[in-house]
Regions:
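Short beta->alpha connector loops at strand-helix junctions that form conserved
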Residues: 73-74, 111, 137-138, 160, ...
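Glycine/small-residue-rich loop that forms an oxyanion/phosphate-binding "nest" at active or ligand-binding sites
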Residues: 72-94
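Active-site regions of enzymes building and remodeling cell-envelope glycoconjugates
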Residues: 65-76, 105-106, 177, 191-197, ...
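Active-site/ligand-binding-proximal alpha/beta "capping" segment
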Residues: 179-229
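RNA substrate-binding interface of SAM-dependent RNA methyltransferases
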Residues: 47, 101-185
Length: 250
């Protein structure tokens, strides 16, 4: 028999206000907290390095919650604290992780990626291909944003995402740096070493000129359509194609 630590909380106006405020980066940083919504994604937290403060749920029968403090709430209360348009039945309150770099052979470097869905998808792709770290420029969308967390489908628990000055990172590294560009060597004719950085640029502007100067090799995904009217690929689509090609040779 499974015993859960069940609590009937008093969801005060103050608590609700704090949880609602976590939709914004400045309050996530102020309280050092972010929300994870939905049983499927919360399940991924169990074997991760993230610390779960507590869970609010309308369904207390989930055995995955047994190691967490779990608060039984009503549907009405759930709608008040959820940051999603269509609330899931459970919300985990988690602590932000330290912005600490790890050693990983292949690392993605994101230059000013702004769309939450793109960042979430790229994190999910990194998890799929076994890439352990993504380095984001300091002006990238915050990966603790609810839409990013949802788009990762739990992959954020297995990929280390950090924010730093990417120009300084690349300048001080001896790794080859591959940059995605509309003009460059064909992806399908490029040989990738064991250790390297792969830069993916902003949705509308690509990689910034000052970062382009630090690229060792520009690569491009060639177009095969007869009319070739498509101007560019979505950054997360491009990431999927490039990673698929890289790992097809391993």
């Amino acid at each position: 028999m499974i015993f859960l630590k069940i609590f009937m909380p008093m969801l005060t106006a103050h608590t609700i206000k704090i949880l609602q405020s976590l939709d914004k980066k400045k309050f996530r940083q102020k309280y050092n907290l972010f929300l994870v919504e939905g049983d499927k994604i919360i399940r991924e937290l169990k074997n991760s390095s993230y610390k779960v403060q507590e869970i609010f749920s309308t369904d207390i029968s989930n055995p995955d919650f047994q190691s967490f403090k779990t608060n039984l709430i009503t549907e009405r209360e759930l709608r008040k604290i959820s940051l999603l348009q269509n609330p899931k039945n459970s919300i985990a309150v988690c602590e932000l992780r330290e912005n600490t770099s790890i050693e990983a052979p292949i690392q993605l470097v994101l230059d000013n990626v702004q769309d939450p869905g793109n960042l979430g998808t790229i994190i999910r792709l990194a998890d799929w291909f076994g890439i352990e770290q993504i380095v984001c420029s300091e002006d990238c969308v915050d990966f603790y944003k609810p839409k990013v967390i949802q788009a990762t489908m739990g992959s954020f628990t297995r990929v280390n995402v950090i924010y730093k000055d990417i120009a300084a990172l690349l300048q001080n590294s001896d790794r080859p740096v591959f940059g995605t560009d509309m003009v460059g060597q064909s992806l399908y004719k490029t040989d990738f070493p064991e250790r390297f950085y792969l830069i993916l640029g902003n949705e509308g502007n690509g990689i910034r000129p000052e970062i382009k100067k630090l690229v060792s090799q520009n690569i491009t995904i060639p177009r095969f359509g007869k009319l070739q009217h498509t101007e560019s690929l979505n950054v997360s689509m491009a990431a999927g194609i490039i990673l698929g090609q890289i790992f097809s040779k391993k």
